[in-house]
Curated annotation (Swiss-Prot):
Designated name of the protein: Acetaldehyde dehydrogenase
Stored CDD domains: ALDH_C
Transmembrane spans: none
Binding site for NAD(+): S11, G12, N13, I14, S157, A158, G159, P160, G161, T162, R163, A164, N165, N269
Enzyme class: oxidoreductase
Length: 294
């Protein structure tokens, strides 16, 4: 089978975990890892594995644009705004793992099929990837007037990129809850928990559905079906208890355990982003290859 060439921009935690996940892909061929710190663990590992290593950032990649058709940006929201412009000019498809939200917001099981021709796809945030599918699952049965999510992650799993993007996290996640989840109003809260040993990523979804006849069984069934769908590409994603129904208020408790590729298993918040990124890139690649043979 033909493969589509991809490169990773950003050699931190997310970029390095992504590198390990891409090695298992049957349709994506990782060619290069791009960073700005030649001493970073990510670039060191990429060099050991035989990938092209660029330590001069995006400038270095643009000198060898033939290295990849799809570029994963695992840097920061502010950096992505600059990168997006340059990569668009170079004719690249971009998968944005920062909360910059320059391109189309995508949650794979909800709306990926609508955005297969986009040049820039944004994966929102870890909290968004974990909770928006649940908001959507409720909303497809009964309209959601308000949805609030609380994402609690281990302090140790929050690197400098995550910490620099807290404001963007809350804004972009809330936007995704509304635009993709379907809630009329959305709100997002992130909590960094310093507990030792580090906790798994936990997410709580609170949804207020509009007044009227509520089919509780249909809502619960829809949520459980969505959990199974997300598990197809994030095996450590699970619901901790049955959804709690209280009048028109629905509460769902979720947990995300990482695959333990590069990051510890408690870093489910980072793992769900890299797993979603690979899923999206594989579908974009299939679409590109199908268009070439059509």
């Amino acid at each position: 089978m033909s493969k589509v060439k991809v490169a990773i921009l950003g050699s931190g935690n997310i970029g390095t975990d992504l590198m390990m996940k891409l090695e298992r892909s049957n349709i994506l061929q990782l060619t290069a890892m791009i960073g700005i710190d030649p001493e970073s663990d990510g670039l060191r590992r990429a060099k050991e594995k035989g990938y092209t290593v660029i330590s001069t950032g995006i400038k270095g990649f643009l000198e060898q644009p033939e290295l990849a058709d799809i570029v994963f940006d695992a840097t920061s929201a502010k950096a992505h705004i600059r990168h997006a412009k340059l990569l668009k000019e170079a004719g690249k498809t971009v998968l944005d793992l920062t909360p910059a939200a320059v391109g189309a917001l995508v949650v794979p099981p909800v709306n990926l099929h609508k955005h297969l021709d986009e040049w820039n796809v944004n994966l929102i945030t870890c909290g968004g990837q974990a909770t928006i599918p649940i908001v959507h699952a409720i909303n497809r049965v009964h309209p959601v007037g308000y949805a609030e999510i609380v994402a609690t992650i281990a302090s140790k799993s929050a690197g400098p990129g995550t910490r620099a993007n807290i404001d963007e996290f809350t804004q972009t996640t809330a936007r995704g809850i509304e635009k993709i989840g379907g809630a009329k109003k959305g709100k997002a809260i992130i909590i960094l928990n310093p507990a030792e040993p580090p906790i798994m990523m936990r997410n709580t979804v609170y949804a207020l559905v509009e007044e009227g006849k509520i089919d509780e069984n249909a809502i619960v069934q829809s949520i459980l079906e969505m959990v199974k769908t997300v598990q197809s590409y994030v095996p450590g994603y699970r619901i901790r208890t049955e959804p709690i129904m209280d009048g028109n208020k629905i509460t769902v408790f979720l947990e995300v355990e990482g695959a333990g590729d590069y990051l510890p298993k408690y870093s489910g918040n980072l793992d769900i982003m890299t797993a979603a990124a690979v899923k999206v890139a594989e579908e974009l690649a299939k679409h590109k290859l199908a268009a070439q043979t059509a």
